[in-house]
Amino acid sequence: MVFFRSVSAISRLRSRAVQQSSLSNSVRWLHSSELDLKSQMQEIIPEQQDRLKKLKSEQGKVPVGNITVDMVLGGMRGMTGLLWETSLLDADEGIRFRGMSIPECQKILPSAESGEEPLPESLLWLLLTGKVPTKEQANALSTELAHRAAVPAIDALPSTAHPMTQFASGVMALQVQSEFQKAYEQGDISKSKYWEPTFEDALNLIARVPVVASYVYRRMYKDGSIIPLDDSLDYGANFSHMLGFDSPQMKELMRLYVTIHSDHEGGNVSAHAGHLVGSALSDPYLSFAAALNGLAGPLHGLANQEVLLWIKLVVEECGESISKEQLKDYVWKTLNSGKVVPGYGHGVLRKTDPRYICQREFALKHLPDDPLFQLVSKLYEVVPPILTELGKVKNPWPNVDAHSGVLLNYYGLTEARYYTVLFGVSRSLGICSQLIWDRALGLPLERPKSVNMDWLDNFTRLNR
């Protein structure tokens, strides 16, 4: 068996690669004056195509990891095997969008006139171009998305189905409008131009998913009274408005929510599913619908609703004024019964999720006296030491799901069953951005090699 480098050496190289990636991306945080996003992409894509060709020809045989039997048996966890340009996840620092941390995004990206949180449109511009947009560019993109947001009637959906089932079905219903499928079937488009109809589909899809998602919400929980889109509002504010929440703070929360949930590199189930299906040249509607079906799984996108339900169970059994000592006992009882504390731990992160921290800062500013937020704060103090003492958890710290439900609940969006739909709307920005780059870079059909246990037994026996 050939071991290219030790695991520790690979780990050091990966850490250095993350640092270098952040450094190289920082160079691209420069503004440009072009207001049209597609024109920006037309300038950038040829440079990145050349970069990929050079990387493949000059460094194509350089090993980037050491595959172990554990990785094969463990769902490929930790295996480096996917190109994902829009974001990179570091175990210590958390997610970086094109090299920018969440605090940097909050500080640098344009916000609404009356708000402080980044506009999702400004993050979308960053994800696609690697450049920070001007306020004018973000506003222009906001206007463009509003103009693209027309959605055909989807009343055939059963109103009793799970919100995610309705949401994914609604996205599939939009697929008949795919520009990519139309161009491919006509056969008059070259491979180098695949990204252009993909761009049209991606922006149309990003524009339309809040309309579909709010339609599902109003249909299920508000007697079907639909609130039309207001093209004077930005993306996050419009989504909040169409759901039926028009307070300035809820609109600000929605901007923050969409931004921090937009992307989390390419290895998670929804991102990988979207990339995998897209690699077959399925259009963005089909690819994103596949991503949503992955997101609907209990091990991926349902955690945010499970956290809120668990917190409400704590209140129901122990009261809102539960002390830290009582809370410790409750957490131990939960763990000793074979259950987990939802919202704690992460497959990659080894510190508190920065997405949790920025939500906590929002709560400290806007709802410091809310009883459920105070309970979340107590859990932040109580749970990590207990999980550390337990000794079976690599990351005892809270993740993004530990906080989001309490914020949404405070502003009146109390239907926890719907929360994964909000997650899905947010993920459209990252997944669709990467689909454009997948086609722009000409990435191939994904087709990993699989083996059986006999193969693994024989291989390990020969290489002991």
Swiss-Prot record:
Compartments where located: Mitochondrion matrix
GO cellular component terms listed in the entry, alphabetical order: cytosol; mitochondrial matrix; mitochondrion
Transit peptide boundaries: 1-25
Cited Pfam families: Citrate_synt
Pathway note: Carbohydrate metabolism; tricarboxylic acid cycle; isocitrate from oxaloacetate: step 1/2
KW Nucleus (keyword) present: no
GO BP annotations listed: citrate metabolic process; tricarboxylic acid cycle
UniProt KW keywords: Mitochondrion, Transferase, Transit peptide, Tricarboxylic acid cycle
Enzyme Commission identifier(s): 2.3.3.16
An MF annotation (GO) of this entry: citrate (Si)-synthase activity
Catalyzed chemical reaction(s): oxaloacetate + acetyl-CoA + H2O = citrate + CoA + H(+)
Major subcellular location class: mitochondrion
InterPro entries listed in its UniProt record: Citrate_synth-like_lrg_a-sub, Citrate_synth-like_sm_a-sub, Citrate_synthase, Citrate_synthase_AS, Citrate_synthase_euk, Citrate_synthase_sf
Membrane-crossing residue ranges in chain numbering: none
Active site positions: 300, 346, 401
SUPFAM superfamilies xref list: Citrate synthase (SSF48256)
Miscellaneous field: Citrate synthase is found in nearly all cells capable of oxidative metabolism.
Family: Belongs to the citrate synthase family.
This protein's name: Citrate synthase 5, mitochondrial
